[in-house]
């Protein structure tokens, strides 16, 4: 059983929802992910998504595009992202780490090489928003060979046939996009989110993690009652980016702690 599956299983036994914050590697400073990741874990993160910057992030809104541009200016590439994972593991970090990025840089690097080096570095899986299942054979085979999870995305507009296809290929969990459109903080979640998650459940028993637009404790509380995981990205990055450098780690920890507390209150978990 993968570390991701073990984490979801443990949380399910406790009646808890997985909290999965996102960091762009190389933002705000080149090495910021090392201290920020530690802070997020201290705040209650169960898994981390580590964003690999790419010059044309099609699925991402203004915040992640901006953080990506800064990371690229800071000289971040695939090799640096893999080294970041290695360094996090060297600190003793044991929670699942997922690399999230676009397919083109991975293809240029070499899919088998990338997956093998990610495994050696200590990664647990991948999220590749622009990799459709019809074109994922090589990546899927490499991930399976190295016992890493490959997570696919579903949107509220996905047909039943698409949901069934993703359910047959995804491992670890299914990334359920909460809203139509690109990433970014929103004021409210979609009214039909529960219906969408119920449709996904008809085709898969994998955990469902909800992302895109999750920006505040109230959102996480709502998701915790419907799904097995909640992903927060843009709102966290905006918050970190507005803090003085010396306050970022503490601020990140407090931000995530507020989400953790909201999720646990929603599910009735008490330590």
Swiss-Prot record:
One of its GO terms (molecular function) is tryptophan synthase activity. Keywords: Amino-acid biosynthesis, Aromatic amino acid biosynthesis, Lyase, Tryptophan biosynthesis. This is Tryptophan synthase alpha chain. The gene is trpA. It holds the Pfam family Trp_syntA. Tetramer of two alpha and two beta chains. The keyword Lyase applies. Belongs to the TrpA family. The alpha subunit is responsible for the aldol cleavage of indoleglycerol phosphate to indole and glyceraldehyde 3-phosphate. CDD domains: Tryptophan_synthase_alpha. It catalyses: (1S,2R)-1-C-(indol-3-yl)glycerol 3-phosphate + L-serine = D-glyceraldehyde 3-phosphate + L-tryptophan + H2O. It comes from Herpetosiphon aurantiacus (strain ATCC 23779 / DSM 785 / 114-95). PROSITE patterns: TRP_SYNTHASE_ALPHA. The active site is at 49 (proton acceptor), 60 (proton acceptor). Its EC number is 4.2.1.20. GO terms for cellular component: cytosol. The lineage of its organism: Bacteria, Bacillati, Chloroflexota, Chloroflexia, Herpetosiphonales. The keyword Isomerase does not apply. SUPFAM superfamilies: Ribulose-phoshate binding barrel (SSF51366). Pathway: Amino-acid biosynthesis; L-tryptophan biosynthesis; L-tryptophan from chorismate: step 5/5. It is an enzyme of class 4 (lyase).
């Amino acid at each position: 059983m993968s570390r991701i599956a073990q984490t979801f299983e443990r949380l399910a036994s406790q009646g808890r929802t997985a909290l999965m914050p996102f960091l762009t590697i190389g933002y705000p400073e080149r090495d910021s992910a090392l201290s920020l990741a530690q802070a997020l874990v201290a705040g209650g993160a169960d898994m981390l998504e580590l964003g690999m910057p790419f010059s044309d992030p099609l699925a991402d809104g203004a915040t992640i595009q901006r953080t990506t541009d800064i990371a690229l200016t800071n000289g971040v590439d695939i090799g640096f992202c893999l080294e970041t994972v290695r360094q996090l593991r060297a600190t003793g970090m044991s929670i699942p780490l997922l690399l999230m990025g676009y397919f083109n840089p991975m293809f240029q690097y070499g899919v088998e090489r990338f997956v093998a080096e990610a495994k050696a570095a200590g990664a647990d899986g991948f999220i590749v928003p622009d990799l459709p299942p019809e074109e994922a054979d090589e990546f899927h085979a490499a991930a399976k060979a190295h016992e890493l999870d490959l997570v696919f995305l579903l949107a509220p507009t996905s047909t039943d046939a698409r949901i069934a296809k993703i359910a047959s290929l995804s491992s670890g969990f299914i990334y359920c996009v909460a809203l139509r459109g690109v990433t970014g903080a929103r004021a409210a979640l979609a009214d039909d989110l529960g219906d969408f998650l119920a449709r996904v459940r008809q085709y898969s028993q994998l955990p469902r993690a909800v992302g895109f637009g999750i920006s505040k404790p109230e959102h996480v509380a709502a998701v915790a009652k419907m799904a097995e995981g909640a992903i927060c990205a843009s709102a966290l990055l905006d918050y970190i980016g507005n803090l003085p450098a010396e306050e970022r780690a503490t601020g990140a920890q407090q931000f995530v702690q507020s989400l953790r507390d909201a999720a646990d209150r929603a599910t009735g978990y008490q330590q």
